Structure formats: structure tokens, C-alpha cells
């Protein structure tokens, strides 16, 4: 596990975008695993600028998002589909047919999960997976549990997650209580992983991810077993290491 600590969020975002750019330049048809939330926003802004400056071509890449709220229409402005379109896809030359985000309103949700998993396998897995981390140590929407859920699945969201995500909604009651998420095995099968974290509220989860025992109660701790994972942190998130 490689740990990079930066003085602030801007420097963290620059490093993350540099890794993504290098991946796409070295393999133009890369399969990228993408994350949402506030942490990757700076990285996405940098990628848009790189595209506008003609430093990068996204036309051949494929993307798979980690998760999506269950029961939320993709047209809802809090859906992760909406987030990705607004914060990245509408501003780069990606082929819309190469964008993959779980369908939270699929009529057969279990089939949606297995189809999503199969599609990732059909592309020979993810080349570079981008992760954030929850204050409870979740990655994707793999919440603290008694076991590691292997493949794409429906999950009931942890109270801490609902509370944390309520800042994006008018009230806590509006936050969906379930989501579709890539599983731990799916994430761990990525050839390379970068995890981004900023802020003191993430310091405890980062400490347990790096120094704790491998424990499904801290889902990110499983990353200790991956052979190419880099944690990209600001000094606050790294403050307990």
C-alpha cells in the first residue's frame, strides 16, 4: 500500500488526475472505475481542463461507476448518473455507450446487479479503480458488515452514510436507504486502485484502513491485500498515520 500525503485538497486532486491521465494515455481504451461524492470533484475538474487543452482523448475509454441509489431515477439531480453527467461526462468526448452506471430503478434489481457484474468481466475487469472512503470506512456502498460482499449487490445504507449524504438532500428523510454497489471482490479485481481522502473526519477511517486488522467492519481494510493500491490524502486525512 503506497501512501501519498499532500498539503491540501488541490494538490491531492492534481495527483489523482495525473494518475488517471497517465492511465488513459498509456492505454487509450482503458476501463475506469469511477467514484462520486465531494472528494473526486477536483480531479474531475482537472480532467475536463486536460481535455479542453487537448491533452487527453476519452473517446475509447469505458467507465463503470461504483454505485447508484436504489429507487432514484437517473434524472433526479441527486442520482449518481446526474452527478457524473454534470461533473465529467457532459464536458469530455466520451462515447455515451461506454458509460456504465447501475440502474437504480431497474424492474429486476437482482438481474441488474448480475448483468453489471458480467459486463465488467466481459471487459476483462477494471484497469484503474478510483475510490473515496466513508467516515465509517466504506468503499463504494460496501458498508460495515460481518462479511465482505463479493459482487455487485443491493445494500442497506448505514446510518452514518445516510447522515453524511444528507448534506446533498433537502433533509435526511429524502436520502435513499438502499443502493446498488460493486462488491469488494469486484473492486479488488481492479488492476490498480487509487483511494482519495481529505479532511480530518476521514483520518480515523484512514488509520484503520492502513494499520487496522482486515475486518469487514472497516471495508476499506481489505485494500491491504491488493498489490497496487495508492492512498492519496491531504494532510488532515493523513493526520493519524
Swiss-Prot record:
Top-level enzyme category: hydrolase
GO biological process: carbohydrate metabolic process; glucosamine catabolic process; N-acetylglucosamine catabolic process; N-acetylneuraminate catabolic process
Recorded superkingdom: Bacteria
Active site: 67 (proton acceptor), 136 (for ring-opening step), 138 (proton acceptor), 143 (for ring-opening step)
UniProt entry keywords in alphabetical sequence: Carbohydrate metabolism, Hydrolase
Coiled-coil zones: none
EC number: 3.5.99.6
GO cellular component, one term: cytoplasm
Pathway: Amino-sugar metabolism; N-acetylneuraminate degradation; D-fructose 6-phosphate from N-acetylneuraminate: step 5/5
Catalytic activity: alpha-D-glucosamine 6-phosphate + H2O = beta-D-fructose 6-phosphate + NH4(+)
InterPro entries: Glc/Gal-6P_isomerase, Glucosamine6P_isomerase, Glucosamine6P_isomerase_CS, NagB/RpiA_transferase-like
Family annotation (Gene3D superfamilies): 3.40.50.1360
Molecular function as annotated in GO: glucosamine-6-phosphate deaminase activity; identical protein binding
Function per UniProt: Catalyzes the reversible isomerization-deamination of glucosamine 6-phosphate (GlcN6P) to form fructose 6-phosphate (Fru6P) and ammonium ion.
Family: Belongs to the glucosamine/galactosamine-6-phosphate isomerase family. NagB subfamily.
Name this protein carries in UniProt: Glucosamine-6-phosphate deaminase
Naturally occurring in which organism (per UniProt): Clostridium novyi (strain NT)
